[in-house]
């Protein structure tokens, strides 16, 4: 009986440690640059936030083709193309920046960041100058989520 009780305590302790390490590995402090997998809860939450943003300026719902998505330390940069129900493009591709606060993804205004005067298209083709202005406006934005500038 003592052996069974000791074994139960060992198994319970192992389960607690496994859960603790799993939760620690997923904590924001240990977040690594990644692209959430299709169908993952994180990707769904980000796309739901994109839909909310899109709804404010459109008269019809849309689905989105994800052209680019990177997440790191609670920040997400996503570039999407809005599509109608038949899969036809209904608007130009759009880059968006989101920050996760209290489990909710909130859009940050990329148009409010001072734009380049050297011919680049701000968030559509972020230059080093634009990225510097973005990080000044939104301290903490990891540079590794921002798409590389086109040449």
What are these regions (language model features)?
Residues 94-104, 129-130:
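Short beta-strand segments and strand-loop junctions that repeat across beta-rich extracellular domains
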Residues 62-65, 89-95:
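Short, surface-exposed coil-to-beta transition loops
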Residues 26-39, 43, 47-48, 53-55, ...:
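Low-complexity, intrinsically disordered terminal/linker segments enriched in charged
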Residues 54-66:
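A short, amphipathic edge element
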Residues 70, 80-84, 93-96, 109-114:
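A mature extracytoplasmic/lumenal domain signature
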Residues 1-11:
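Bacterial N-terminal signal peptides that target proteins for export
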């Amino acid at each position: 009986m003592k052996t069974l009780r000791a074994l139960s305590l060992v198994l319970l302790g192992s389960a607690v440690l496994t859960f603790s390490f799993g939760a620690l590995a997923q904590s924001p402090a240990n977040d690594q640059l990644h692209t959430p997998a299709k169908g993952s809860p994180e990707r769904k939450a980000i796309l739901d936030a994109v839909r909310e943003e899109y709804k404010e300026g459109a008269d019809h719902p849309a689905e989105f083709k994800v052209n680019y998505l990177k997440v790191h330390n609670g920040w997400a940069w996503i570039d999407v193309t809005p599509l109608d129900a038949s899969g036809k493009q209904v608007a130009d591709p759009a880059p968006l920046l989101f920050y996760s606060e209290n489990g909710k993804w909130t859009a940050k205004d990329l148009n409010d960041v001072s734009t380049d005067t050297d011919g680049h298209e701000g968030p559509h083709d972020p230059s080093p100058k634009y990225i510097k202005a973005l990080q000044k406006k939104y301290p903490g934005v990891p540079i590794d989520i921002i798409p590389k500038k086109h040449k």
